[in-house]
From Swiss-Prot:
Family: Belongs to the class I-like SAM-binding methyltransferase superfamily. Cation-independent O-methyltransferase family. COMT subfamily.
Protein known as: O-methyltransferase bik3
Biased composition annotated in UniProt, kind: Low complexity: 8-25
Organism: Gibberella fujikuroi (strain CBS 195.34 / IMI 58289 / NRRL A-6831) (Bakanae and foot rot disease fungus)
Keywords: Methyltransferase, S-adenosyl-L-methionine, Transferase
Gene name of the record: bik3
């Protein structure tokens, strides 16, 4: 299986290479720190070389620095170099800090999260002018907070480049803090993270003491945090503002570079199907199918979802697409806990469906699909395949495992490794086999091609 399109070097761990423990040509071997610095310098040269050759801005902490340092459309060589720079820098920090500073660094990260939460709650991001500066005294008055507390927390945030102090007694936006106001996607994610995710993370121990062995989706850290027996989706659906915020956050994640639908387009040989019918199970309002329809004119689509989503999706597709696209896309009301009504489709697509569900429910969902497969049908599962420890870069692995933990905290679910996916297939039907697993470069998700053996 391709994990993320990046070679991890000769030792297969964390993207670094070594020069051997016994030296080369009589020279002493480089220390782990020297190897990391060597890799850092090499990949920094590659990254900066690309940026300079294309007259692109180099990474900077200045207020007008770009939000994204490297376009996701940049060539793979530049993308790999950036990831390796990040990986080497992270490992250098961890290596030089050593075990003695571990707890100090952990608590620093916790404080950054709480400062983000505090700043969001008291509207500090919005009250600081986007241009120029404001005194701590005036800002504290506008926010209704104590000036000393504001100054203490702001200056801690500045150690992580959140805000800046251009002169004593005054605060201004940094590139990062400004982006968390002006970029709607980042702003929504900030509010979601600080109002929902932060209390959920803090309630994990409480949940596991209260329900030590439960995998029920309504007995997770989310339920402990908000003192509810409802599943997360049910709970937020009763709060219109929170539900709308969640929808915007999901849209932002779905359109982020590592979740971009271009990876769905490139992750399977769609053109090789010729004229074919695709059933998108839980396909929402049709973003995936539109992208595929634009690239492959021989494909026709049925998008299945719950009634109000189907109603909205049908309108959106008709209003926002040419007839050549819209006429090839149909909508159908469907509950994936019932038997699949479309029999013998060429493709059954389930994109980001299973990570919300535990093993038993995932088996039920897939079984209902498999019962309607034809002998030549494919089930395409596009979801996370968690890598084996140490087989991808540290910067990628910690994000992937953070998502895995997040699924547990919100739903008592998980992101699965390859063995976890195989276990689901075996529980559904022993005839099922994985035909291929493809992880397009730059994608967090993999396309798992499942067929009847």
């Amino acid at each position: 299986m391709v994990s993320n399109g990046i070679s991890n070097g000769t030792n297969g761990t964390n993207g670094t290479t070594t020069n051997g423990t016994n030296g080369v040509n009589g020279h002493a071997a480089l220390s782990p720190l020297e190897v990391l610095v060597q890799d850092l310098n090499k990949n920094t040269t590659t990254l900066n070389g690309y940026l300079r050759a294309n007259k692109l801005p180099e990474p900077s902490f200045e207020r007008d620095a770009p939000i994204i340092n490297l376009s996701p459309d940049a060539p793979e060589e530049a993308q790999v170099a950036k990831e390796k720079v990040l990986d080497s820098a992270l490992q250098i920090f961890q290596l030089v800090s050593g075990p003695g500073e571990y707890l100090q660094n952990v608590i620093t990260g916790y404080h950054y999260m709480e400062i983000l939460r505090w700043m969001s709650h008291f509207k500090i991001f919005e009250l600081v002018p986007l241009e120029g500066k404001i005194s701590y005294t005036e800002l504290a008055s506008k926010a209704g907070v104590a000036e000393l507390r504001l100054k203490t927390l702001a200056r801690m945030g500045m150690t992580n480049h959140l805000f800046a102090e251009p002169e004593p007694g005054f605060i201004a936006h940094s590139a990062t803090s400004a982006a968390l106001v002006t970029n709607n996607r980042f702003s929504d994610q900030r509010v979601w993270m600080t109002s929902i995710i932060a209390p959920v993370i803090a309630s994990m121990v409480t949940a596991h003491e209260r329900w030590p062995d439960s995998t029920a989706p309504n007995k997770a850290a989310f339920n402990a945090a908000f003192n509810t027996d409802l599943r997360m989706y049910e709970y937020i659906s009763k709060q219109p503002d929170v539900y709308k915020l969640f929808g915007r956050v999901m849209d932002a994640i779905a359109t982020s570079p590592k979740s971009d639908l271009k990876h769905l387009v490139s992750g399977f040989d769609w053109a090789g199907l010729g004229k074919a019918n695709v059933v998108d199970i839980g396909g929402n309002i049709g973003h995936s199918c539109v992208k595929l329809a634009e690239a492959f004119p021989d494909l026709n689509f049925i998008i299945q979802d719950i009634p109000h989503v189907v109603e909205e999706g049908a309108k959106v597709i008709k209003e926002n697409n040419e007839a050549s696209i819209a006429n090839r896309i149909q909508f159908q009301e469907y509950d994936f806990f019932q038997k699949q009504p479309v029999v013998g489709a060429d493709i059954y697509l389930l994109r980001q469906i299973f990570h919300n569900w535990d093993f038993e429910n995932s088996v039920k969902i897939l079984k209902n699909t498999v019962e309607s497969m034809g002998q030549n049908s494919h089930v395409l599962i596009m979801d996370f395949v968690v890598p084996e420890p140490g087989t991808v870069s540290s910067v990628n692995e910690r994000v992937l495992r953070s998502r895995d933990v997040g699924m547990m905290q919100l739903f008592n679910s998980l992101e699965r490794d390859l063995e976890g996916w195989k276990a689901i297939l075996e529980a559904v039907d022993s005839r099922l086999k994985i035909n291929a697993v493809n992880t397009p470069y730059g994608s967090f998700m993999s396309v798992i091609d499942v067929v009847l053996g």
